[in-house]
Swiss-Prot record:
It is a single-pass type II membrane protein. Keywords: Cell inner membrane, Cell membrane, Copper, Membrane, Signal-anchor, Transmembrane, Transmembrane helix. Belongs to the COX11/CtaG family. It comes from the Bacteria. It comes from Rhodopseudomonas palustris (strain BisA53). GO terms for molecular function: copper ion binding. InterPro entries: CtaG/Cox11_dom_sf, Cyt_c_oxidase_assmbl_CtaG. The keyword Metal-binding does not apply. NCBIfam families: PRK05089.1. The chain crosses the membrane at residues 20-42. One of its GO terms (biological process) is respiratory chain complex IV assembly. This is Cytochrome c oxidase assembly protein CtaG. Its main location: membrane. Residues 1-19 are cytoplasmic.
């Protein structure tokens, strides 16, 4: 006669172990999903925070000239240009100017598409030192929209800005005598051509 096994039955324990492993895997998957979702949500929040506060050298957008006019104190503004992954030549028409704080000023960048086909780019920007981002106000800028250039096309791109007079009351910037405005154009792979803004399509106006 065959004898039945006398050892303990481990089947329930194995089932409990399998269920515990499944629960742990589910919790880990949920945590990963939440982390990915949070990272995507953090990007627009960070961009909004930078625009509102000027953090990390992010400039501000102004609707009009400041109240009260320009101050006697002047400041030098330097202009920097870069491209990343685009067959473009991109440079400011002047590398440095000195302006009264609060004075609305227009400068131009020149860009040329060296490729034999249409290309589209978007300009990222910041100012240095980073503490002046909240005071650098742009009224109009080519960085507000995508830029599409035809084969070998050259275009002049305006920037209309002023340095907020509130800078003069900021004790942290008492010794500040220069600001650098920097742009970098990046490619947009699948962007559709867009019509030029009215300020860019018309004849060049204004002077430094």
């Amino acid at each position: 006669m065959k004898q039945r096994p006398t050892g303990p039955d481990t089947t329930p324990r194995n089932r409990r172990g399998f269920g515990r492993d499944t629960a742990v895997a589910s919790v880990c998957g949920l945590v990963v999903a939440l982390m990915v979702g949070a990272s995507y949500a953090a990007v627009p929040f960070y961009n909004w925070f930078c625009r509102v506060t000027g953090f990390n050298g992010t400039t501000q957008v102004a609707a009009a000239a400041p109240q009260g006019g320009a101050l006697k104190r002047t400041i030098a503004v330097r202009f920097d240009s870069n491209t990343n992954g685009l067959p473009w030549s991109f440079a400011p028409e002047t590398t440095e100017i000195e302006i009264p704080i609060g004075q609305v000023t227009t400068v131009y960048y020149k860009v040329t598409n060296r490729a034999a086909h249409e290309t589209t780019g978007q300009a990222a920007y910041n100012v240095a030192p980073l503490t002046v981002g909240a005071y650098f106000q742009k009224i109009n800028c080519f960085c507000f929209t995508d830029q599409t250039l035809g084969p070998h096309e050259t275009r002049e791109l305006p920037v209309v800005f002023y340095v907020d007079p509130a800078l003069a009351t900021d004790s942290d910037n008492d010794t500040l005598n220069s600001i650098t405005l920097s742009y970098t154009f990046y490619p947009l792979r699948s962007a559709a051509p867009k019509p030029l803004a009215a300020s860019e399509a018309g004849p060049r106006q204004g002077a430094l």
